[in-house]
């Protein structure tokens, strides 16, 4: 929540968080990498999306952490993601892959972007 609050204060982009899963419920071995990926996604939104709203949803479905970050920005052509230079996307994919997880990006020009992170995870009570 501090990350979203700080992001909103710094950028003026309205943020909302949904779901009842708390960061402290995620094992540290997983939460650190996922947190870094969320930071990178927010940085990309700030620098490229021209968004006014960001919604973050965190859920635990079975033994899986499901985190979705969605903005209402300008969107992008996802076919260009593998062509673009830059280490941000590669680092995000590598971090999630290292957790045996999956990073999915869905976007269309003019319709915002959604990043979904799915990671196997036994939650802490």
Question: Which positions does each model-derived feature cover?
Answer:
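Coiled-coil dimerization/phosphotransfer module
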Residues: 1-125
């Amino acid at each position: 929540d501090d990350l979203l609050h700080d992001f909103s204060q710094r950028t003026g982009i309205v943020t909302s968080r949904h779901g009842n899963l708390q960061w402290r419920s995620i094992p540290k071995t997983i939460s650190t990498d996922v947190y870094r990926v969320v930071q990178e996604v927010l940085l990309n939104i700030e620098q490229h999306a021209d968004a006014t709203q960001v919604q973050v949803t965190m859920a635990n479905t079975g033994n899986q952490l499901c985190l979705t970050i969605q903005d209402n920005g300008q969107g992008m052509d996802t076919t260009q993601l593998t062509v673009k230079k830059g280490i941000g996307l590669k680092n995000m994919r590598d971090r999630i892959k290292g957790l045996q997880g999956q990073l999915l990006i869905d976007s269309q020009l003019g319709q915002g972007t959604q990043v979904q992170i799915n990671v196997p995870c036994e939650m802490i009570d």
